[in-house]
Amino acid sequence: MTLYQKAKQLLQSEYEKNFEIVKDSFYHKSFMNEKIRHSLQVAGAGNGILRNETYFKSKSSEFIEIAKTAILLHDIFRFNEIRIKYQDNKKVDHGVEGAKYLSELTDFNNLLITLPVKHHGHMIDVFYEDEAYFSIKDEELKDQIKHILFAARDADKIANWQILTKEYENMRLVWLPHPEDRTEKQGQITNKVWNSFLEGEVVLKSYIQTNADCLVSVLAWVFDINYRYSIDYSMRLNHLDGFEKILQDLKVEQSKIDTILNIVKDYISKRFY
């Protein structure tokens, strides 16, 4: 059995054992179902990056197998996180806990896997400041970890953009902070979120107050995309059109929507083309 096959088995096992505990809760059950599907979608997007980006084309099949495994398992602790929230109403960092969990398993105790899993959802500065990363003496290993992390982060964003823009009505419950509130108040973009976006920055979670804030923060992930293939793929899937429709549904002012889309298009043009 290959490493990737073992990873798929582990992912399915973690999903099934935690799903059994939360299955009586519609919200937690729905969230968990979305996350197992998401993991497979991220794996698919990640495979595209690994096949098409120049950096990975020169790497060995063994290295690519490890990279594919890290990407597939990026959310390995999500199912435990949802179960813990259901049982104890406690929050955990699924990236940090996922890395700890995998480091205890012989097959997956590899910095090429555990560090990308740990930091796939963090602000990138947190990764660079992690002693486990910056204390590595082998510069080639550090570069390999960084590129796998970049692939995992990009694939995660692409998959989230896809499911949110294509299945918005079904995803409102698990994505928006106030999914039942369709008033104009939820279409307001608060100042901290707006200013961060205008500066071309990833929006801090602590800034998010409204549904519109949430959508703008998700779209602002574009400022953290690393590979041109990721942008090419997203553009082929018409994610920007999907975001425009969602922002309109949330009753965001059209002038602000136009500004948002123009900023994103201008950034993509200058950064990747």
Give residue ranges: language-model regions.
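His-Asp-centered metal-binding catalytic motifs of divalent-metal-dependent phosphohydrolases/nucleases
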Residues: 62-83, 87-90, 94, 98, ...
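Short, structured loop/turn "capping" segments at alpha-beta junctions
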Residues: 110-113, 124-128, 161-162
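Conserved N-terminal diphosphate/IPP-binding helix and adjacent helical/loop segment
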Residues: 1-28, 35-41
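Divalent metal-dependent phosphate-bond-processing catalytic cores, especially two-metal-ion Mg2+/Mn2+ enzymes
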Residues: 2, 30-36, 40-61, 73, ...
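Short coil/turn linker motifs that delimit alpha-helical repeat modules in TPR/alpha-solenoid proteins
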Residues: 35, 64, 109-110
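Long, charge-dense
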Residues: 105-107
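Short linear capping/connector segments at secondary-structure termini
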Residues: 26-27, 118-119, 132
